[in-house]
């Protein structure tokens, strides 16, 4: 990109950030934050609490785990289906916790709702790890579920329980689960010390299991988890990620030593430009770099170097960018729904900018340096795109703004609710709602869809699942972003 222009990278970057198709009005980030948290109530599985705010949802999957003799009710459906996938659920919980840890003070009255959303996830993860050296990683058969279009309250598809254990390794899921529990223990450290200790103790046990019985669940449970949440990147990053969060939560030297000792073996320098439910490398580098920037951990210096390189790779105009930008200014990266990359990478930009600000540092990026303010502006531009500053002139968050997706790929949202249609709607009976051109009858407020790609185009149609399906891991990093921007803009 830089080689094709006479402009310096800094000028090109400024143009991308400041020039848009037209002048847009400001955004109500507080309203967007409220709605982004509310979305998680629409994804709840199990028996709903009295304070449930999305009233069109009802109890579902109340016998989950019974076939294995355990209680696995609760937790979250990952997206527009009715399967509970443990890997993305754990990552979602980790990212909600990180959002609260770093940006909770800016969330105002929505902080407690964010904490409730985290606890809905951790309560389930505690159930999933109740047996030593076992993690229940999935409830539901994805193939039978995806063959039906029915609301969760009616579902009669297989609720098969899948687990990892000593003979069926799954270090990536166990490592991420340990990270989620450890991160959440920080959230509850002062709010509920007893619960916080339970979370940290369980995280410690699950991490020990993850590293003792190393292996990928994509191998041991291939038929169940692939191609849905196959771990394409290997389990090594989740071991470092879990250790990093346990070190942050416990301050124990053993986890610091694990990170330093294993950073080469566990490929800490590999794929450092990636971050999401499958790949934690960029997140590890940003998280660990905070200690380096505080002057407390020179032994983690290589992680800061990786973090700097990652940050530079996101900036438009750099010689070897790891992402593209659409004409409308959207960050675009291949692999699944694009908004998962937009929110997770923007979260790291904002988080790192804050770490740099407190240390009075900048990021060297070849012929120019990136200031914390610049990183924040890049992140804000992405959030504003989601909220409506884009060529389609629409918000990609359901219920925010005057124009937003109406026909999202989501079973519960698109099929009439049990409130309006008490009679059961069976597996294939829901197909007419999937193919309908009518808007979804139930607003899944706060849901952020997969969104457009490099063309900035968006077909508001359920069959385009990569574009119109929301996921929990799109929204989770957004909590921190919206919390920060609601307090500072």
From Swiss-Prot:
GO terms for biological process, alphabetical: cell wall organization; cellulose catabolic process
Major localization listed first in the record, in broad terms: secreted
Ranges that cross the membrane: none
GO MF annotation list: cellulase activity
Compartments in which it is found: Secreted
Residues annotated as the enzyme's active site: 81, 409, 460, 469
Reaction(s) the record says it catalyses: Endohydrolysis of (1->4)-beta-D-glucosidic linkages in cellulose, lichenin and cereal beta-D-glucans
Residues spanning the signal sequence: 1-25
Keyword check for RNA-binding: no
Glycosylation sites: 453
Enzyme Commission number(s) of this protein: 3.2.1.4
Assigned GO CC terms: extracellular region
The keyword Signal is annotated on this UniProt entry: yes
Keywords associated with the record: Carbohydrate metabolism, Cell wall biogenesis/degradation, Cellulose degradation, Glycoprotein, Glycosidase, Hydrolase, Polysaccharide degradation, Secreted, Signal
InterPro entries on file: 6-hairpin_glycosidase_sf, 6hp_glycosidase-like_sf, Glyco_hydro_9, Glyco_hydro_9_Asp/Glu_AS, Glyco_hydro_9_His_AS
Pfam families given in the database record: Glyco_hydro_9 (PF00759)
Family recorded in the similarity comment: Belongs to the glycosyl hydrolase 9 (cellulase E) family.
Protein's name in the database: Endoglucanase 4
Organism, as annotated: Arabidopsis thaliana
